[in-house]
C-alpha cells in the first residue's frame, strides 16, 4: 500500500484540529483543518470511496477480505507469524472453540460499563439494540453455542474475525489458517472517512453540511436523524461527540477527543465513581490515578531517551 493524498490531507487536518484544542488552543488552525476535510469529503463523494452505504455493508468493513477498501489510511496486516493484528488478542477474553480453534487466553480489554450501557440505551420495536454498531463492536453473549458459560464483561469483537462472524456475513472460514494468535489479518484503521466527516461537523457546527455529516452516519447506524432540538449549537456538539464515541469504539481515538476538549478530569471523576460503585475496585481506581497533570502528552520513548544520555528531558508527568 501507499499513502494517498487524501490520507495526508485527513491526517494533517486532524493535527490542525488537535492544535486548535487543549492545551494549545490555536483556534486559527480550525480554518486549515476545515479546508482539508472539505477536500477529502468532496473527493470521497465524487469518487464514491471510503463509504459503506448501509448498516449491513458497514459490518463488512471489519472483515479482512475488505482491507484497503473503506479506510482512508490503515496499518496493513497479513496472515503470518508476527505480521498479524495483535489488537484481536489484546481485546479478547477466553472464548469457546465455536469462535476460533486456537486458545485465546483471556487478555480481555473489555468494554467499559459506561460505553457498554451507552450502546444499549435504545431498542427497536422487536426489543433489539437499535444501533447496529452495538453488536458489530461488542459481544454481549453469556452462553456460548457449545453451552459453555461466559460470566465476564462484554468484549470487543470489531477486529475479531471469528467463525460465527464470518459465516453470518457470508464469508469463508479462515479458522484453519489462524494457527496462533498473531495471525489475524484484519487491518487497523488510522483514519476513516467517518472521522473526517465528524471532525468537519465539529468545526462548522449545525450548518446544513455539518448536519448532513452527522445524519449520514447516524441514519446508517440507527435509522434516525437529528431532531430539531439536537440541531441547536450546544446539543449538536454533544451529538457529534456521541457519534464519535460509538463509531470509533476500540479504534484508539476516544482519548485524543477527551484531551482536545479538555474533558480528562470529568472522565477521571467517572472512574472514581465507578470504582466506589463496585466496592472500591482497585483496578478501576488505578486507571483513574494514571490521569494526572501532564499526561495529555505521551512520554518520550525509553529507547530515544537512551540514544544520547542527557539530550532529552522526560516529560514531567513521567519522571
Model-derived segments and their meaning:
Residues 1-83, 128-319:
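Acidic/polar-rich alpha-helix caps and helix-coil junctions
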Residues 91-116:
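Short, cationic low-complexity segments
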Residues 101-103, 115-121, 223-228:
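Charged, low-complexity surface segments at secondary-structure and domain boundaries
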Residues 83-96, 273:
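Short, polar loop/linker segments at the starts of domains and inter-domain junctions
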Residues 88, 110-112, 151, 156:
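Intrinsically disordered, low-complexity, compositionally biased regions/tails
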Residues 4, 110-121, 301:
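Residue-level signal for threonine
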Amino acid at each position: 500500500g501507499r499513502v494517498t493524498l487524501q490520507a495526508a490531507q485527513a491526517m494533517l487536518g486532524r493535527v490542525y484540529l488537535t492544535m486548535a484544542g487543549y492545551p494549545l488552543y490555536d483556534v486559527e488552525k480550525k480554518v486549515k483543518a476545515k479546508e482539508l476535510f472539505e477536500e477529502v469529503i468532496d473527493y470521497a463523494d465524487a469518487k464514491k470511496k471510503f463509504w459503506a452505504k448501509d448498516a449491513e455493508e458497514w459490518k463488512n468493513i471489519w472483515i479482512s477480505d475488505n482491507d484497503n477498501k473503506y479506510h482512508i489510511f490503515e496499518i496493513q496486516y497479513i496472515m503470518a507469524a508476527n505480521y498479524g493484528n495483535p489488537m484481536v488478542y489484546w481485546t479478547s477474553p477466553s472464548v469457546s472453540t465455536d469462535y476460533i480453534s486456537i486458545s485465546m487466553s483471556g487478555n480481555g480489554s473489555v468494554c467499559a460499563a459506561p460505553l457498554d450501557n451507552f450502546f444499549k440505551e435504545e431498542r427497536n420495536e422487536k426489543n433489539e439494540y437499535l444501533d447496529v454498531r452495538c453488536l458489530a463492536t461488542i459481544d454481549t453473549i453469556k452462553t456460548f453455542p457449545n453451552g459453555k458459560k461466559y460470566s465476564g464483561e462484554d468484549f470487543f469483537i470489531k477486529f475479531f474475525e471469528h467463525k460465527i462472524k464470518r459465516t453470518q456475513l457470508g464469508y469463508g472460514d479462515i479458522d484453519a489458517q489462524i494457527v496462533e494468535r498473531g495471525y489475524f489479518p484484519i487491518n487497523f484503521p488510522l483514519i476513516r472517512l467517518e472521522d473526517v466527516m465528524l471532525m468537519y461537523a465539529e468545526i462548522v457546527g449545525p450548518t446544513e453540511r455539518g448536519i448532513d455529516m452527522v445524519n449520514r452516519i447516524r441514519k446508517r447506524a440507527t435509522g434516525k436523524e437529528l431532531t430539531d432540538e439536537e440541531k441547536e449549537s450546544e446539543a449538536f456538539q454533544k451529538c457529534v461527540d456521541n457519534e464519535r464515541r460509538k463509531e470509533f469504539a476500540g479504534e484508539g481515538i476516544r482519548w485524543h477527543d477527551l484531551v482536545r476538549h479538555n474533558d480528562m478530569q470529568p472522565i477521571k471523576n467517572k472512574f472514581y465513581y465507578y470504582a466506589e460503585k463496585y466496592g472500591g475496585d482497585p483496578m478501576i481506581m488505578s486507571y483513574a490515578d494514571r490521569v494526572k497533570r501532564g499526561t495529555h502528552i505521551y512520554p518520550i520513548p525509553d529507547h530515544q531517551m537512551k540514544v544520547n544520555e542527557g539530550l532529552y528531558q522526560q516529560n514531567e508527568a513521567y519522571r
